[in-house]
Every structure is written in C-alpha cells, then in structure tokens.
Amino acid sequence: MADGSDLENNHKPELDRSQPGSTSNGSQEQKDPDEIAPEYATGVRLILVMFTIFVSTILVSLEIGIIATAIPGITNEFRRLDDVGWYGSATFILAAAASPLWGKLFKYVDVKWTYLSAVFIFLVGSIVAAAAPNSVSVIIGRAIQGWGASGVLGGTLIVINYVAPPRNHPLLIGTWMAVFMVSTILGPVIGGGFTSGVSWRWCFWINLPVGGPIIVLLLLFLRIPKHIKKVPATWQEIILALDLPGFCLLLVSLVCLTLALQWGGQTKAWNDGSVIATLVMWIVLSIAFLVTEWFQGQRAMTPFSILTLRMTWSNALFCLISYAALYQVMFYLPIYFQSIHGQSAVKSGVNTLPFLAFFALGAVVSGGVIGKTRYTQPFELLGALIMTAGMALIYILDVDSPQAMYIGAEVLFGFGVGICNQIPMTAVQGFSKQEDVSSATGIMVMCQTLSGAYFVAIAQSLFANRMLATVLSGAGHLDPALVLGTGASELQHVFSGEDLTEVIAAYMVGIKDVFAFSLACAAFAVLLSLIIPFKRLPDHGKKDKPATEEAAEEKSEAEGKVSGDKEENHS
C-alpha cells in the first residue's frame, strides 16, 4: 500500500492532459486510449440538476439567517440567555472546520453519494434541533446542520464545475451566490413568521418536507460525467487524507475563540483568568493547526501545494475579507432597522429587499460578463471599490437617517458586493487542475464559513461591549442582562421614556462600531484585489493549463528574461 503522504502523487496519470501533444517523456502527441471526451449536461437535464442543487442551497442558507428570529422563542422556552451566541456560532464553527474534509471526500469518494450524505446529515441536524428537549440539544442540532451545510454548499459548487459546460460556470456561480444571499437574508423573515405564528421548532421541521424531495430528485437526475474520475485510493488512504488531526485542532481553536469573545466584557471581565486562558488556547491551537498542515503535506486539509499558489491564496484572502464585510451588514442592518427605527422583523426584512435585488443583479451581471471576457481580477477590484463606497454610506447612518438614505446606501453596497463576492470561487476553480477542484473548492468554502465563525463572533463582541458600556455610562440603573437579553425588535415594548432613548443611543454606538469594522474590511478587500493575478480564465476550446503549470511557465519566462538581460549587458 502506498504511503498516504504520497497519495496524490501515486495516482497522477502518466499522460499530462493539460498539454496536448506531450507525454511525460516529452514525445509527440499521442492519443490516450483511456481518455474520455467531456460530456456535460445540457437542456432539460442541466436545468433539473441546477434546480435541485439550488433548492438545496436555499434550504441550507435559510438556516443561517433563520435563527436570528427564532432565538426569542428558544430563550423563552429554555431560559438560557447565556447560550444565545451558540445557536448561531455552532453552525459556522462546524461548517468552517468540516469544509476541507468535504472537499477531500468529493475527491476520493463518489460525488453523488457524498452530496446525498451531506443533505442527509443536514436533515438529521434539523430533526435534532426541532425535537430538542433543552438548549444544549438545540446547539448540537445546529452544529450537525453546519456539518451537513458545508458539504451541501461545497458540493453544489463542485457539481456545477463537473456537470455544467465550462463556459457557463461564471454565470451559474453568480446565480448560485444570488440564491444563497437572498435565502440567507429572507431567513429571519421566515423564522419570525414561524416563531410568532406557530413555534420556533418549525424553523427546523420545515426542512424535512423540502429535503425529502431534494434527495429523490438528486437520485433521479444527478449524473456525474464519465470523464470526471475520483482519485483511486483505499479506505485507509482516504482516512489519512482527511487530516483528522488538523480538523480537530481547527475545530477546538474556533470553540476557544468563540468562548473568549462571548465571555469577554459581557459575562466576565476581559482580564478574567478563563477569558485569558481561552484566548491563549486559541492562539496555541491555531499555530499547532498551521504546523500540522505543513507537515501533513498533500494529506493536509488545506494542501500547501494548492494554497501557496498566488491565484489561490490571494482569492482566498479576498473571499475571507469580503465576506467579513458582507456578514456584518447582513446581520446588523436588520438590527439597525428594528432597534433604531422600531420596525418589526418582517418590515426590516422588506427594507433589505433593495440590498438583495441589487446583490442578485451584481452577481448575475458579473457572472455573465466574466463568462464572455474570461477576466476576473478587474471585476473584483470594481466590486470592492463600489462595496467600499456603499459601506461608507452605511457607516454614516444615524438614529434620524431618512429612508432614502439607508436604501441608497444598501443598494450601492449590495451591487458592489454582488459583483465581486462570487468571483474568487470562479477564479480558483477555473485555474485548478481537475483533480484539485474539490480540494480547492473546500478551501474556498472554508474561507466563506471561517469568515462567519471569526468575524461574526468578533462583531458581536464589539457590539455588545460598546453598547453595554454606553448604556452603563448613560443609564447606570439599567440591568445589563436585561438590555442584552431584549431582542432588537422588543426594545420599544420593554423600555420607555429616557431609558428607551439611552438604550437606542447605545445600540447606535454599537452598530456604528460594527459598521466601521465592516468598512475597514471592505477597504482592505480593495487592496487585496490589486494582488490577485490579472489572467484570463483558461479557454475551454483548448486544453486548459492548470495553475501549477502556469506558475511554472511564469517562473521559466522570468528566468529567460533575466538571462536575456544579462546577455545584453555583456554584449
């Protein structure tokens, strides 16, 4: 049996298929008898497959946002205010840690059955959360949902790459991103309807009657083309390739960070021993994770052979930071509407529709244009610039800002982030070798969900600390636990008079700090877009050159240029 560390090298095809006419020994063009011409889904079958996986995305993304308006019902039943932060973060933590594992599974195991497994795990998590007898069970259910959700999201993007004609990838990924974002933001509106009209448990039960037909449709219509072959490996080799030590280190480090941010300044002082200990553990475990990844080589969750490519790491960073800017607006713009303007969850959802509409427009337009031009970097720069301008307008919103002002701000921000948000996935998939697509997709989905796990927790800590400090300085007689435990849409009912004025002012201070953080992330994304290589996506009428070979060509060209300069100087 081959050593697991050489797993990928042991199964490389002898013929270098990225360069027609060449073999491993440099001979003239030969026809590989094992090579199968690509056969992609088209017409009705392509529509049915895309419809099914997009509905899967809707199911998963609704659960990301739906918890926001389900929390009041959960806390009313279980009386565990100290668990509130975990209802949302448990999903992000498991999704972030598990994404690279799913990428490896899609590489070594049948894509169809792996995707079905992810949907099934998500539905199991929904059942656990819906039937939860206590708060801990809700958290466990949400964590299982996150585990399955990461497989569904990554699997959807892999299926698009494998099943759809390559020329359609940018448009389909842009459409997928629009579907994902619209569903995520509509989640709180739907969750509010279930929580107030029936029960918070229906926020999770509703997944079953939708998930069942999805599984049936996947069984009927999902067919992976024959030219897409899984990497042959034994189960022992697959288990080694999953990098379970790296998974555990990343998972525990995220838990430590979340604990520290939820304790610090809210239930415990920042200089409390337990807060300091969890922060130290987060740093130590994060370093241990990076060291483990380095020594794992090709078995790593995030293989450095893929991650160290400039096309990959620059787009991964852009993805991480642009999502940080996006998530804060997604979660805190509705809080702004509900707390500052006294709107209901439904009304605040309606007021985010302009953001959703222009996000979807930007995503579809940029996907279509990139499909024609084959260039990605200019649109990442353009989108980041528009996103930053929109974020600056959102930052200056205040307690008395008129409707025209906040709608204009969210329209500009939504259009900008829609243009650039899905491009990193398109670029990384487009420049990856076929056998690396699943691992590269896992890395990018990890960046998306890590952004939620890290930056949403940081923003929540920033908001809560600043808001409480402002309340205590202006209305010291108020109970901090009451202020924290009162939902944004309930402030008008719980507080009145001067107390209400002070609480609203404190909310505005906390929200502004979060928006400032988001503005900094958007501006940083502009800088990151300048680092991304200016390259045309491979032409699909020819054999595509993977990123690794393009990197080798760049190095060869650079060496040739230096050599030529030396000869000129010598002469």
From Swiss-Prot:
PROSITE patterns: MFS
Location within or outside the cell: Cell membrane
Compositional bias ranges of the Polar residues kind: 19-28
Protein origin, superkingdom: Eukaryota
Membrane topology designation: Multi-pass membrane protein
Any single Pfam family the record assigns to this protein: MFS_1
Protein name from the UniProt record: Dehydrocurvularin exporter
Protein species of origin: Aspergillus terreus
